[in-house]
Amino acid sequence: FLPLLFGAISHLL
């Protein structure tokens, strides 16, 4: 589920 978390962070950034 790491990629999903990174995706969320990227969206916030």
UniProtKB/Swiss-Prot annotation:
Tissue: Expressed by the skin glands.
Name this protein carries in UniProt: Temporin-GH
Source taxon at top rank: Eukaryota
Keywords for the protein's UniProt record, in alphabetical order: Amidation, Amphibian defense peptide, Antibiotic, Antimicrobial, Secreted
Keyword hit for Secreted: yes
Residues recorded with modification Leucine amide: L13
Role of this protein: Antimicrobial peptide. Active against the Gram-positive bacteria S.aureus FDA209P (MIC=44.3 ug/ml) and B.subtilis ATCC 6633 (MIC>64 ug/ml), but not active against the Gram-negative bacterium E.coli or the fungus C.albicans.
Transmembrane segments: none
Cellular compartments per GO CC: extracellular region
Protein's cellular compartments: Secreted
Protein family per UniProt: Belongs to the frog skin active peptide (FSAP) family. Temporin subfamily.
Keyword Secreted: yes
Any one Gene Ontology BP term: defense response to bacterium
